[in-house]
Amino acid sequence: DKIIEGYFDGEQMIATTGQAYAVPANYASKSKLVVGDSLKLTIGPRGRFIYKQVNPVERRRLVASLEQAPDGNYYAVHKHQRWRLLKASVSYFRAQPGDRIAIVLPRDLPANFAALENLIAE
């Protein structure tokens, strides 16, 4: 097995070599990965990719509003800030634009992406 370490950038793992590896959106969504989380990728002898979160960064939580941009991407909006969300997370929660959502962000790192933690029922 080949083992590669890196960090999550919101969509993919960036290895210490600088190479990017696609992280399955369902894994990132289910694991609530945030920008900066350390990941380990094991590539099996038959090409199977297995990701594992090895060192999560400190997190903070916010309540935001869900918006959908004209290009189809989803964003969490809080005051004058916005963070992109994985479509897999929005689909899983069956969230709709205008819904109030709970998001998770890295506490001490700038981020363009947020993890969708939950849908807040009105």
Where are these regions (language model features)?
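Short metal-binding segments enriched for Cys and/or His
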Residues: 42
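Short acidic DE-rich linear segments
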Residues: 120-122
